[in-house]
Amino acid sequence: SFDLFHAGHVTMLKMEKELCDYLVVALQVDPTIDRPGIKNKPTQSVYERYVQLQGCKYVDEILVYETEDDLINLIKTQTLDIRFLSEEYKDRDFTGKQYCIDNNIELHYHLRRHKYSSTELRNRVYTLENAKRTELVPGEVFDQYSPELLNKYEKS
């Protein structure tokens, strides 16, 4: 759902764009609509997430959908050569899997080679906000994401 857009999202989109000519991103309004208890409700509005995706140079088009039924309709009405998913879906059933298989749409499962996630970001913000209240800021929270690390990765 691209909630709390972060470096991991950008890294994933960059890898996906390297494997295709035109990258279409499907953005779900709220995954809890038809999967309550399974997915988290987004912190950011669909508009905020849309604007963030729109600002990412790797994204060519964004299609917004509400339900899993809407997603399968999007998959069926778009001309797709490849569908990207997180590696966590590799051995599971998911919306549109059989349709993609039956219609020779390649399923590409990308590996997460980093620690960035929306959950990690929420936890980091929570930790820092709590630390402000108690005036105890753990150094490792800052060290892990220090500007000095940028120099190491800017060249790649």
Task: List where the protein language model places each region.
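Nucleotidyltransferase catalytic core that binds NTPs
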Residues: 1-156
